[in-house]
A protein has these predicted regions:
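Active-site-adjacent beta-strand/loop module that shapes the phosphate/pyrophosphate-binding cleft
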Residues: 31-36, 129-150
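Short loop segments at secondary-structure junctions
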Residues: 35-37, 58-62, 78, 98, ...
Length: 224
């Protein structure tokens, strides 16, 4: 048995309506038939930009740990919808037209941590909440890091208080498994990093690897 998600355009779209649109997401309402001749059903969902997150990792001589154990760069940010300060990975929206996941990840790492990386790979791809949201999220691994000499980006609002912090990878993974880290991208990225590092980095995908992204979203609506 092959475990692989597959694209499916076989369902008949009867109607589509954009009910509301804001700067970050829109509310869409569709009517569709799951089977030919079946009664139509309605579904509402949020149309969202794609997003990226970055596991920035250092180890060996670059690590601050005595034994050279791997560390990941994390940030702590207030998230108003859940009323919580969350430990997260550097992350952001793919809201620039035509922008690749790699370019977006490079930008977010630079803007949020003043770091850049020479080596990039794809770690894991997820749909944040496929039952109600189109957001497609790619988590990338960034290594061979160096500090940006000049960063003109001004952090505002919740990002104004970002404090990038190096955390031992083992501690971060333990915190995720203990229910102390709740951000979905962070949990997925940390566990993926721990697993693939244990395999000697075998199986890492390229930064531009094929990606089963949502075909529609904030910028592109389905046509009848």
């Amino acid at each position: 048995m092959q475990l692989r998600d597959e694209r499916d355009f076989s369902r008949e779209l009867v109607s589509h309506q954009r009910m509301w649109s804001g700067p970050v997401f829109a509310l869409d309402a569709d009517t569709l038939r799951l089977e030919p001749g079946a009664d139509p059903i309605g579904r509402q969902y949020l149309a969202h930009h794609g997003a990226v997150a970055v596991v920035a990792l250092r180890e060996g001589e670059d690590s601050s740990q005595i034994d050279g154990a791997p560390e990941v760069l994390m940030i702590r940010q207030y998230r108003h919808p859940v009323r919580a300060n969350l430990w997260e990975l550097p992350a952001g929206l793919m809201d620039h037209a035509g922008e690749s996941a790699l370019v977006a990840a490079e930008r977010e790492l630079r803007e949020e941590t003043d770091m850049e990386a020479l080596t990039w790979h794809t770690l894991v791809d997820v749909f944040s909440s496929a039952g109600c949201l189109t957001e497609s999220l790619r988590v990338l691994l960034a290594r061979d890091l160096r500090r940006v000499e000049r960063n003109d980006f001004v952090r505002e609002d919740e990002e104004a208080d970002l404090r990038p912090t190096w955390v031992p990878l083992a501690q971060a993974v333990d915190a995720a498994l203990a229910g102390q880290i709740h951000n979905a991208a962070a949990v997925a990225g940390l566990l993926a990093t721990e697993r693939i590092r244990a395999k000697g980095w075998q199986g890492l995908r390229s930064a531009d690897a094929p990606w089963l992204r949502a075909p529609y979203g904030f910028e592109v609506e389905p046509e009848l």
